[in-house]
A protein has these predicted regions:
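Conserved Rossmann-like nucleotide-binding pocket used by diverse enzymes
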Residues: 17, 66, 130
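Alpha-helical cap/lid subdomain in secreted, periplasmic
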Residues: 55, 59-60, 79-206
Length: 206
């Protein structure tokens, strides 16, 4: 290996190590009693059931989990009501939105930009954000197995935040866990909260 090639190799290797370190940043643990907001749509609100996942998550974590889910909300709606969420001064926001955008055929780039703008405003306030992927609701998916929309992975990577993937897709693909084609039942919301709690532990947030 020539001196120039060796130098190039060392520069590339060093850059790779630095990138890996920045991407594996340890999350700050949220203490019991701290305020956490669940921000989203009907899947957060608990439509179709007697319980919602934030209620179960509060039992599992000891956090004060505030449910800011509104049935029918799109990414634009959540962005518009974000000041109310920020006024609660949460340590962490569990953010899941997009399903209604898909159903209403909102342009993907518009949805993506709304989600990014919401995340950036929260981060600018020093709030930790965990993004929750939602299924890509299509006609074929409604009668088969759901899959996450790929944009969530892109957003999480771009904003360097953790992504809880496949949770809703798995639950809504199981008829025993849902109340209709796009909403969970009591068992489904409870299972979501339990799996989310496991993921939060893996991320060092719990």
């Amino acid at each position: 290996m020539t001196a120039i090639n060796r130098r190039q190799f060392l520069l590339i290797t060093t850059a790779s190590i630095l990138t890996a370190c920045s991407n594996s940043k340890k999350s700050t643990q949220i203490a019991k009693g701290d305020t956490v907001v669940a921000l989203g749509d009907s899947l957060t609100a608990g439509h179709g059931a007697n319980i919602a996942y934030p209620t179960v998550l509060q039992e599992l974590t000891g956090w004060q989990v505030i449910n800011h889910g509104v049935s029918g909300d799109t990414s634009a709606d959540v962005l518009n009501r974000l000041p109310e969420t920020l006024s609660l001064n949460p340590k962490l926001v569990l953010f899941g939105i997009g399903g209604n955008d898909f159903l209403r055929k909102v342009a993907e780039n518009e949805t993506k930009q709304n989600i990014i703008a919401t995340i950036q405003q929260m981060k600018n306030k020093g709030i930790s954000v965990l993004l929750i992927a939602e299924p890509h609701f299509t006609v074929s998916a409604l009668f088969g197995r759901f899959q996450d929309h790929p944009m969530y992975e892109e957003i999480a990577r771009q904003e360097n935040i953790p992504l809880a993937s496949d949770l809703w897709s798995d639950i809504l693909s199981d008829n025993s866990l849902k109340s209709d084609q796009i909403h969970a039942n009591d068992a489904g919301y409870r299972q979501f909260a339990e799996k989310l709690a496991q993921f939060l532990k893996q991320q060092g947030l719990l």
